[in-house]
């Protein structure tokens, strides 16, 4: 009888997966961009009552950081998570978020980048459906010696990527560009003396074994991420599935920011307890000196992209307003 009722559609049961989506990501599975991917998969499958099945591919097994965006456009993966910050100049609206403006947390920056993209609908993202946006936590300094002043950082070999390398150069350090995965060996061999990144990597990549000092309040930059879907795949989805995905877009940005901010706190607690890592903060007067050196980066962004027809002043004004608004809303 149950079989008859089910066949007649009179009893509700989880639907057979009718729609399969492939989701590519580039960092290793335990890292926060992949944790947010698994959370999104679980929620979409649950909220569509099993109608959608999402197959996830972490660790560059399907697409890597360099071909992620083009791979999604080409349909190699239905969905992909890319670090827009890794491609300077390709995503100029989002790039405003990566400037050195002292983001207090990943949550504040993640909700801000989502709102910014929603408002400006950047033409560089027109070929895809934007599923969500988020950032890593603010980048701070993990090092083999205490960094308490500009003098301490002068000529000091620190790994950074994208905008971070430019920031370190301006501050007088000796930036070394390399992927996060190469850092442990470079630290071990003394090729670099530290790393400038969000602090969850102290535990995730075990940098606390080498970097016994952290300067935790410089908040130099964030790395922005976009999760995008192949446009044809999106267009082919039924309306009820589209609604589930649309309803999760901002929610996922908030969830990811809060998850990784909490993860930073856990990682720092672990680093202090397990490896006796010493955490320092710069006094405001010293911090002001650092940011005074970095101000020209804002001017350069304004001029360079304004010359290309982007309303950069309005974009930066909005970024600062969003930062102020969400800093209050999501105060630590």
Briefly describe each language-model feature range.
Residues 11-17:
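Sec/Tat signal peptide C-region and signal peptidase I cleavage site
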Residues 2-9:
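Bacterial N-terminal signal peptides
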Residues 18-108, 116, 123-332:
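N-terminal secretory/targeting leader peptides
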Residues 9-10, 140:
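Intrinsic disorder/low-complexity segments
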Residues 113:
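P-loop NTP-binding core
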């Amino acid at each position: 009888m149950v079989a008859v009722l089910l066949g007649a559609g009179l009893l509700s049961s989880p639907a057979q997966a009718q729609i399969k989506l492939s989701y590519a990501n580039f960092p290793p599975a335990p890292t926060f961009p992949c944790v947010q991917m698994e959370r999104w998969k679980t929620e979409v499958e649950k909220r569509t009552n099993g109608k959608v099945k999402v197959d996830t591919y972490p660790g560059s097994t399907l697409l890597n950081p360099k071909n992620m965006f083009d791979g999604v456009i080409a349909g190699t993966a239905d969905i992909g998570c890319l670090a827009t910050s890794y491609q300077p100049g390709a995503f100029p609206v989002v790039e405003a978020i990566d400037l050195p403006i002292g983001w207090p947390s990943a949550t504040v920056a993640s909700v801000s980048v989502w709102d910014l993209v929603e408002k400006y609908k950047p033409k560089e993202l027109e070929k895809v459906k934007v599923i969500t946006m988020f950032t890593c936590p603010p980048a701070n300094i993990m090092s083999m010696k205490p960094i308490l002043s500009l003098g301490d950082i002068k000529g000091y070999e620190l790994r950074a990527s994208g905008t971070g390398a430019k920031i370190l150069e301006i501050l007088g350090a000796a930036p070394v560009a390399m992927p996060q995965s190469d850092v442990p060996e470079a630290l071990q061999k003394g090729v670099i003396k530290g790393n400038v990144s969000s602090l969850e990597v102290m535990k995730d990549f075990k940098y606390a074994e080498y970097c016994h000092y952290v300067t935790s309040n410089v908040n130099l930059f964030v790395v922005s991420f976009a999760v995008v879907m192949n446009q044809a795949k999106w267009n082919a989805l039924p309306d009820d599935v589209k609604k589930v995905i649309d309803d999760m877009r901002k929610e996922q940005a908030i969830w990811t920011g809060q998850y990784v901010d909490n993860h930073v706190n856990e990682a720092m607690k672990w680093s202090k307890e397990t490896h006796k890592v010493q955490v320092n903060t710069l006094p405001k007067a010293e911090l002001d000196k650092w940011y005074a050196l970095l101000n020209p980066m804002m001017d350069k962004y304004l001029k360079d992209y304004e010359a290309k027809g982007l309303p950069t002043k309005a974009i930066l004004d909005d970024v600062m307003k969003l930062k102020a608004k969400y800093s209050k809303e999501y105060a630590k």
